[in-house]
């Protein structure tokens, strides 16, 4: 089966990053959102998954280049770094997939850089992609249109993170807002 590496790109310096306070307590950053540990938990048995959080450790491009699939996620503040990473991986001939909040609102930002794009949540599309990829029949774009049933979401694979490096973590018990007010963008 596949060797999969999931990457959380480093954040740019920001007010929210706590860069000045973290060294005082011996930590490197806050725990990223659970999306990559959740993707790891959604990955069918038989695939090997590892997670690289660039906010904690540098990307070993030689190691990552040997993976069958490399996935990136990111928010608006990570978009520039996401492009840098994708360019490097593309130059090395690596098969890449990209998803997350920024891709979901600006998917053409990564045109020509990623082999596959995920829009929206990925609880149903990630396993579907892996099945299709294994059979050599994957698509270029996946979009999950249905809401995720949070009662069926597996426990994220936090064991794949260096949890002692983080100041604090987060848990997820719901997503967004259940209302669909037309004036709101949540």
Give residue spans per PLM region.
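Acidic, low-complexity intrinsically disordered segments
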Residues: 2-186
């Amino acid at each position: 089966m596949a060797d999969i590496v999931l990457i959380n790109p480093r954040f740019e310096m920001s007010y929210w990053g706590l860069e000045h306070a973290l060294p005082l307590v011996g930590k490197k950053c806050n725990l990223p959102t659970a999306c990559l540990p959740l993707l790891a938990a959604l990955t069918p048995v038989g695939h090997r998954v590892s997670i690289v959080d660039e906010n904690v450790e540098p990307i070993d491009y030689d190691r990552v280049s040997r993976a069958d699939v490399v996935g990136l996620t990111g928010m608006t503040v990570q978009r520039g770094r996401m492009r840098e990473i994708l360019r490097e991986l593309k130059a090395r001939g690596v098969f890449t997939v990209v998803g997350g909040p920024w891709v979901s609102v600006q998917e053409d930002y990564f045109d020509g850089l990623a082999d596959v794009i995920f829009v929206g949540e990925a609880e149903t599309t990630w396993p579907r992609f892996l099945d299709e990829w294994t059979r050599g029949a994957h698509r270029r774009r996946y979009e999950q249109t249905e809401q995720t049933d949070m009662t069926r979401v597996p426990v994220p694979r936090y064991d794949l993170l260096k949890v002692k490096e983080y100041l604090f973590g987060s848990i997820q018990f719901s997503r967004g807002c259940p209302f669909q007010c037309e004036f709101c963008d949540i």
